[in-house]
Structure formats: C-alpha cells, structure tokens
Design a protein with these regions (language model features):
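Pre-catalytic or accessory/regulatory segments outside the catalytic core
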Residues: 83-84, 89-122
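Hydrophobic or amphipathic alpha-helical targeting/insertion segments
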Residues: 111-149
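Beta-sheet-dominated scaffold domains
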Residues: 205-340
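N-terminal beta-propeller domains
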Residues: 1-97, 143-232, 317-339
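Hydrophobic beta-strand segments of well-ordered beta-sheets in folded domains
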Residues: 80-81, 117-119, 312-315
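Short acidic-glycine loop/turn motifs at beta-strand connectors
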Residues: 85, 92-95, 123-125, 130-133, ...
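Beta-propeller fold detector
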Residues: 98-103, 137-150, 194-199, 236-242, ...
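Repeated scaffold domains used in trafficking and secretory/extracellular systems
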Residues: 66-75, 103-117, 149-170, 204-212, ...
C-alpha cells in the first residue's frame, strides 16, 4: 500500500481473516463485489498495521525513544515499570520516570515475579526484593532450625535460604526458582527458605519459563513444555504438555476471559516449532497460530500484551542470534496483498 492515509485505510473492506502466511498462492479469492483494494480475506504480511476485529486496517504509530542505553528485561508489576539499562535496575511509574535501585549484571536477562505485595527479581547472580525500599534477597546462605509441634513430639527440620536462580515465579503461596536443571520451591507462605534435601524437581534441561496457570505451573525448557499439576508440590505431578522447547524469554500473560476461563490471566508463549500457544489451567496447551501463521525457528524473543484504542493484542519480537530486530519499525505501513 503506497503510504495511505488513515481515512483511506479505514475505508477499505479489510481482511477479516487477519494475517495468514500459510494460505496457498493459488487459493481462490472471494469476489466481494466492490472496487476497494482487498479481494482476499487474508493479509500475507503486514508491517505496522493493526487489524480490527472485522479486519479493517489501522496504522500503527511505530516507536518512540524513551531512554537511551542497552536495555532489556522489561516488567510491569504492582503498578511499577522495571527495566535493566546498562547494568542498572531502573524502576518507576512509567518508562519516562525511572530511578536506579540496584546495580546488576549488564547482560544477564532478569526474571521477575510479584509475591505478597513485593516484586522479586533475579538473574542467577543478582537478586532482590523491591517494595517501597530495596531489600536484598535471598542474600548470603544461612541455616534455620525450626521446631514444629507434631503429636506432642518435637521434630527438628533444617531449612536453608532459597538458591539464587535465573528464573523465578510465585504460585500458591510459594516461591519457585529455576537453576540449571533444577526447580526449587520454598516452604508454604515462607518464600525465603526451603529444605534443599526435599524441595526440588529435576528437569530434563535448562528452564527458561515458569508460568502459573490455575493451581499448576507451566515449565518451559529447551526441549519441551511441562505442566506441574497440583497446588501441593509434594503431591503434584510433572506431566509433558508440549514436545517442542520454548523460545527463550518469549512469553507473557493475557486475560483469561480471552480463552473462556475464569483465571485473571493465563500464559502464552512461542515454541521452537514456530507456534504461539496458550497454557490453560487444566494443563491443556492450545495452539493459536499453527493454521495461519508460520514462523521460522528463533533463538530468543520477547512478548507483551498491548492494549490501545480499543484493540487488545499480543506483540512479539523474535530474533535469531545476531539478527537485527525488525519489530521496531518506523512510522510506515506495509501490506502484501495476494491478487487473483
């Protein structure tokens, strides 16, 4: 489309089928009986184009620089915006009002989770908890002797500080930490301590994603997606949910109502077979894009839920190692139309 204005975009018939790059080039397009440009239900490719529910195109406004620097690991939690910029963990009410709260590794991806009104963060080396003031967590290793009254007999249990991991999550009153091929979980309602002799699961490979869904949790590794089914980790079952590995860091959460479930939000992610999926509370993984969008294998990525001007959509940025990111395009509109 040669630089159309917004009025021209809105007057088009639109593409009610959305973006679809899996349709055959020879597929017969329906005659809509109009002289408007679209003569197919599908767009094959779109750059900075939003589509309404009816398929009408809108111009996406591109991007604007908020703050210069090597930035990654963006997170929004408890009404605050978190990001790592040039080795500084920055926090603020929005991207234009940030203050530094910690010095962290410049390159390691940061994982975040909210728990009991605080935001916890960890990258495998640096970790902490942010409330109104910064508190170190989990800190130096310590041991705790805790006594419990069970049947009038005192039992000594050795508790230790939770390990520092590269990925963390909070679910069912416990903190979960992923380190290499091990998934650790804290004591109930005690997110800083665990029994390292019992409070863990062994994983088949390096975990990149921990995402709660209902009483369970999805675990994404290099080789597949697993679902930990059950609220009590001591009786929970670890089941295989999807046979392809997660694209590292390419996951986010969306409102559960979009998938007719009662959860406030559920996880969505990209896997290495080029498919976006949602993890439902039952442990079912539902593919969202396989029948209409084919994506090549990517090395890493990022996702975010974008809600603007009445449109709610998941925005993904996917890259191969060393490839330039073409998701941040300038203010332009490009659409590829198949004519028959």
């Amino acid at each position: 489309l040669p630089t159309p204005n917004d009025d021209k975009l809105l007057r088009m018939d639109g593409w009610p089928g959305g973006v679809n790059n899996r349709i055959r080039e020879t597929e017969q397009a329906s005659d809509r009986g109009t002289d408007s440009i679209p003569n197919s239900a599908f767009l094959r490719r779109a750059l900075n184009v939003d589509l309404t529910t009816e398929g009408h195109p809108l111009r996406r406004r591109g991007y604007a620089l908020a703050q210069a620097g090597y930035a990654h690991s963006v997170f929004n939690g408890n009404g605050l915006f978190f990001v790592v910029i040039d080795g500084a963990l920055m926090v603020g009410p929005k991207s234009s009002e940030l203050v530094q709260v910690a010095t962290v590794n410049k390159y390691l991806r940061m994982s975040y989770t909210t728990h009991a009104g605080a935001v916890y963060y960890s990258n495998g080396v640096d970790s902490g908890r942010y409330t109104t003031t910064l508190e170190v967590w989990p800190g130096p290793d310590q041991e705790y002797d805790i006594h419990t009254d069970e049947d009038l007999e005192l039992a000594d249990n050795l508790y230790e500080t939770m390990p520092i991991g590269h990925v963390i999550a909070s679910n069912n009153g416990r903190m979960w930490v992923g380190t290499r091929d091990t998934l650790w979980f804290s004591e109930g309602m005690s997110p800083h301590i665990c029994r390292r002799s019992t409070n863990y699961f062994m994983l088949p490979s390096y975990p990149y994603m921990l995402q709660p869904s209902g009483d369970g949790m999805y675990i994404g590794t290099e080789t597949g997606i697993s679902f930990l089914k059950g609220a009590d980790p001591f009786t929970a079952e670890l089941e295989g949910a999807y046979s392809y590995g997660i694209v590292p860091f390419a996951f986010t959460r969306v409102p559960g109502r979009r998938f007719e479930v009662e959860e406030d939000d559920v996880p969505v992610w990209w896997t290495r077979d080029g498919v976006m999926s949602v993890g439902l509370p039952s442990g079912e993984v539902r593919q969202l894009t396989r029948d209409r969008l084919a994506a090549p294998e990517y090395g890493f990525g990022a996702m975010s839920l974008r809600e603007r001007e009445g449109i709610s959509q998941v925005v993904s940025s996917l890259q191969k190692g060393g490839d330039a990111n073409n998701m941040g395009a300038s203010d332009s509109v490009v659409a590829e139309i198949r004519r028959c």
